[in-house]
Amino acid sequence: MTQIGKECHNDCVIKQQTGECIMPREGVFARVLKGGEIHVGDEVTLLPPLEDPPLRAAVITLSDKGSRGEREDKSGPLIVEMLTAAGYVVEETMLLPDEAKALKAQLIRLADSRQVNLILTTGGTGFSPRDITPEATYAVADRNAPGIAEAMRYHSLSITPRGMLSRAASVLRGKTLIVNLPGSPKAVKENLEYILPSLGHGVRIAAGLDGECARK
């Protein structure tokens, strides 16, 4: 019995030599929902998987000032609120500076180790030299999913011509969908309200939980 996506917490010698820890990839995997203990020899009852498990998400806010405590993060909590209302389980939130290396590391960890279904970032999608979110997102992608970012730009242009200035990306890494949202709470709300009704189906297809979305 081991946790889903178990990580190496000590940067062990094996990882340093091979670049990858040797972790179980088969067997009984579990996620801790409530604290407790399990011991060798304990009897374990396996329950059947849920027919319609909730989608799991993570939210990353990118802000130099926010990471230094100079600005309150309002967009991240708003995204969590909207995702929760839509039925997602938000498993992690974090506030990072506008640093590509740190963002790429977290995107890889959340997609590969935590295996969340959806990662939403907020901030860092404009023209400032420190706006590196799209580049970091593309760098970790396996496949592009441009329609989501294009839909957000289309919707934003119906509100303000400045919508054309968004460089937001939407990609897939493995079975995880990663979408860049704007930085301002107002723009976050407008964009997320627009894409959320259709987003879940795409997330479920990527996760292997739904079939394709062809129209009859």
Predicted region positions:
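Solvent-exposed alpha-helices and their adjacent loops that cap or buttress functional pockets
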Residues: E20-M23, I38, L50-D52, D112, ...
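Short beta-strand segments
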Residues: I60-T61, T121-T122, N180-P182
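Proline/glycine-rich low-complexity loops and linkers
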Residues: T133-K216
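N-terminal small/polar loop signature for handling phosphorylated ligands or for N-terminal nucleophile
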Residues: M82-T84, V89-T121, G126-V140
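Metal-cofactor-dependent catalytic cores
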Residues: M1-P53
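Glycine-rich phosphate/diphosphate-binding loop of Rossmann-like nucleotide-binding domains
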Residues: D52-D98
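SAM-dependent methyltransferases
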Residues: G41, L47-A57, M82-A85, Q115, ...
